């Protein structure tokens, strides 16, 4: 694709969700489940998949191994019409695989490969020449790939802004004890930041949504969108604040990828020129559908599902 809407940079891995499991899984010799299956996972491929299904042209920039798991990812991208021109395959590494242990109430713990592709992704895997082809850059999760540190992120975002791209970013909890100071310069280029409340509280050391948002705004983030789970989201831009409630009546089966789905919905709405509240409502609806199925990209099969839920949603 020569003309793109979004470039997603970040992890592309394979998830093996095991559900439902209980806390006593290690107290028995055998733990039968109804079904065990592989799905694609990782923040960037999750976003690329959902944004593509929502109707926008999307490219994935990541690094995978030249192995069975990597081929699984390539096949998925082709099926979902995701541009993989800048998805690098490296014969010297293993594609990261995450085994997700998911409880009955949707909470999860990951068992991960510390030496997999997720940990090898670095700035050399970013194809800057393609930035001019897209409108928006999504750095799918700050801290997820440790080699994409504050310095690397600053370079990526500088290159994106030189091409007038909108920059969105999500984050996870720091893996290597990174601090807000480590990424503050990079954040000064970010137009929309999508942390969840627990991650943002940990990183900033603040307790309230307002205080947390102010820390990110002080770094130069233009709009802070804090995901608050069952409460929806909190938005702050300058002196303007807004709370947008979640979709009511949703019972989560699996929360894996819910944040990625939220970001995807928000990004899709941004590209369509929707205002902040409309973007948040669309994001909340996208996330709500995602948690009703096992797997990060299983629930949101098409745009129609989101639009149908929006008709019932009073956010």
Swiss-Prot record:
Q: State the UniProt keywords alphabetically.
A: Kinase, Transferase
Establish whether keyword Ribosomal protein is in the entry: no
This entry's Enzyme Commission designation comes to: 2.7.1.-
**Coiled coil segments of this chain:** none
Please tell me whether the keyword Kinase is annotated for this protein: yes
User: What GO biological process terms are annotated to this protein in UniProt?
Assistant: D-galacturonate catabolic process; D-glucuronate catabolic process; DNA damage response
| GO cellular component terms given for this protein | cytosol
Question: Which CDD domains did the record assign?
Answer: KdgK (cd01166)
Q: One MF term from GO for this chain?
A: 2-dehydro-3-deoxygluconokinase activity
- Xref: Pfam families: PfkB (PF00294)
> What family is it from?
Belongs to the carbohydrate kinase PfkB family.
Task: From the Swiss-Prot or TrEMBL record, give the protein name.
Answer: Uncharacterized sugar kinase YdjH
Species of provenance? Escherichia coli (strain K12)
The upper taxonomy is: Bacteria, Pseudomonadati, Pseudomonadota, Gammaproteobacteria, Enterobacterales
């Amino acid at each position: 694709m020569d003309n793109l809407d979004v470039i997603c940079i970040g992890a592309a891995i394979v998830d093996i969700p095991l559900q439902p499991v209980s806390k006593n899984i290690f107290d028995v010799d055998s733990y039968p489940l109804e079904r065990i299956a592989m799905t694609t996972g990782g923040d960037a491929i999750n976003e690329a998949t959902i944004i593509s299904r929502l109707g926008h042209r999307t490219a994935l920039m990541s690094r995978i191994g030249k192995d069975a798991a990597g081929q699984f990812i390539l096949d998925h991208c082709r099926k979902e019409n995701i541009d993989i021109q800048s998805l690098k395959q490296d014969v010297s590494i293993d594609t990261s695989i995450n085994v997700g242990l998911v409880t009955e109430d949707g909470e999860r713990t990951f068992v991960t490969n510390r030496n997999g592709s997720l940990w090898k992704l670095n700035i050399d895997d970013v194809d800057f020449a393609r930035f001019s082809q897209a409108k928006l850059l999504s750095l799918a999760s700050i801290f997820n790939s440790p080699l994409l540190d504050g310095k690397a992120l600053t370079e990526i975002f500088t290159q994106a802004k030189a091409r007038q791209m909108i920059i969105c970013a999500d984050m996870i909890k720091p893996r290597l004890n990174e601090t807000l100071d480590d990424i503050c310069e990079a954040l000064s280029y970010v137009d929309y930041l999508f942390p969840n409340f627990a991650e943002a509280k940990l990183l900033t050391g603040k307790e309230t949504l307002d205080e947390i948002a102010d820390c990110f705004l002080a770094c130069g983030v233009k709009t802070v969108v804090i995901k608050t789970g069952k409460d929806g989201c909190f938005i702050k831009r300058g002196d303007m604040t807004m709370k947008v409630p979640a979709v009511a009546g949703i019972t989560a089966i699996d929360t894996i990828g819910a944040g990625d789905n939220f970001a995807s919905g928000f990004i899709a709405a941004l590209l369509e020129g929707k205002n902040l509240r409309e973007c948040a409502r669309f994001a909340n609806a996208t996330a709500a559908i995602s948690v009703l199925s096992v797997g990060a990209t299983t629930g949101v099969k098409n745009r129609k599902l989101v639009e149908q839920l929006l008709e019932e949603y009073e956010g």
